[in-house]
Amino acid sequence: MKKKFLKGLCCAFVISITCLGASSKAYGWDGKKDGTGTHSMIVTQAVKVLENDMSKDEPEIVKQNFKILQDNMHKFQLGSTYPDYDPNAYKLFQDHFWDPDTDHNFSKDNLWYLSYSIKDTAESQVRKFTALARNEWEKGNYEKATWYFGQAMHYFGDLNTPYHAANVTAVDSIGHTKYEGFAEKRKDQYRINTTGIKTNEGFYADALKNSNFDSWSKEYCKGWAKQAKNLYYSHSTMKHTNEDWDYSASHALKNAQMGTAGCIYRFLYDVSKDLLPTENHKINGLMVVIKTANEIAAGTDDYVYFGIERKDGTVQEWTLDNPGNDFEANQEDTYILKIKKPSIKFSDINRMWIRKANFTPVSDDWKVKGIKVIADGSVQYEKQINKWIHGNEKYYIN
């Protein structure tokens, strides 16, 4: 919200320091706006890997969904590079980092960072965009679904980057940018075409054992990110040699391709109905995605809240306020909300609402286009609102 002027000044100061301390971009593996580069190589090869590893005994519906993904390959590639060019992205790419041991990005772990911390991490973004992809896939919007899934795999690729898994930014070390440039120049040397196993064994088979997507995804990401973090300390710092960096990049990119193939395999099962049990798991948080309408003066600087009422009458409400300017016209904002203990099932929620409260005596009216509520690995609720919220108004979304 613009009213947080000091927050904006602080963030601007940090960005200026970053620009002085780094001569190039601060995000992970290289990716071009046209869907080429290291990120694109990772997802392209992952599809080839899965094609070569696919067991002949896979259900026909899985094969059909895989063919749909292959038919939308360019959208997958474009999605895999888009997060580095998203105009609404955090300026320092905080959500492209994730230390698997602290469960934070660098905005919480690095002492030089003076601005407000960002809750989103590379790991949480994998879950968010996979849920959005699954939602569109189930509606038959395969191009949009594949584009969303490409974004999920961008963040999965980032958490396989040694510097990103160790929360070492371009401010912390010039090695960050140099290492990723090193990998980009040699990426074609690091391509793989198979993991050496079939999808009915090894890590592929393990990917289907936990029906709770959020739980599975977090543990799956943690396993790969820990390897990347270890590679940073053992072979990837500025103290290491070119031979060390070659070892590091070859292993990190091999892991990214293998791990992405596993993510795709799990996704194919999740969108192929009735192949995995659909349990109503307990949740300890929600992701809320709100889109502001694309109209003149549709945005707001007033206070905005999201609330739930459980069936037992318990009420919880959160302030929706990300660092920077949220609720701008045509902007999509995501909020990670922690549910008070005890954990609940989504079906335990009776009502949900958004509420606006005036920041000044004069209302700054807000036009909401739509909302998505993500929990338990899926978009649990979605609504096209297309409504002006006036004054101190409370709007029930269900």
From Swiss-Prot:
Residues 275-283 are annotated as: Linker. Its EC number is 3.1.4.3. Zn(2+) 3 binds at residues 84, 96, 154, 158. It is found in: Secreted. Zn(2+) 1 binds at residues 29, 39, 158. GO terms for biological process: killing of cells of another organism. One of its GO terms (molecular function) is toxin activity. Ca(2+) 2 binds at residues 321-322, 324, 326. Its cofactor is Ca(2+); Zn(2+). It catalyses: a 1,2-diacyl-sn-glycero-3-phosphocholine + H2O = phosphocholine + a 1,2-diacyl-sn-glycerol + H(+). Residues 1-28 form the signal peptide. It is an enzyme of class 3 (hydrolase). The keyword Signal applies. Ca(2+) 3 binds at residues 300-301, 325-326. Keywords: Calcium, Cytolysis, Hemolysis, Hydrolase, Metal-binding, Secreted, Signal, Toxin, Virulence, Zinc. Residues 284-398 form the PLAT domain. One of its GO terms (cellular component) is extracellular region. Residues 29-278 form the Zn-dependent PLC domain. Ca(2+) 1 binds at residues 299, 364. Binds 3 Ca(2+) ions per subunit. Zn(2+) 2 binds at residues 164, 176, 180. The protein is composed of 2 domains; the N-terminal domain contains the phospholipase C active site (PLC), in a cleft which is also occupied by the 3 zinc ions. The C-terminal domain is a putative phospholipid-recognition domain, which shows structural homology with phospholipid-binding C2-like domains from a range of eukaryotic proteins. The ability to bind membrane phospholipids in a Ca(2+) dependent manner and toxicity is conferred by this C-terminal domain, which also contributes to the sphingomyelinase activity. Bacterial hemolysins are exotoxins that attack blood cell membranes and cause cell rupture. Binds to eukaryotic membranes where it hydrolyzes phosphatidylcholine, sphingomyelin and phosphatidylethanolamine. The diacylglycerol produced can activate both the arachidonic acid pathway, leading to modulation of the inflammatory response cascade and thrombosis, and protein kinase C, leading to activation of eukaryotic phospholipases and further membrane damage. This enzyme is hemolytic against horse erythrocytes. Belongs to the bacterial zinc-metallophospholipase C family. This is Phospholipase C. It comes from Clostridium novyi. The gene is plc.
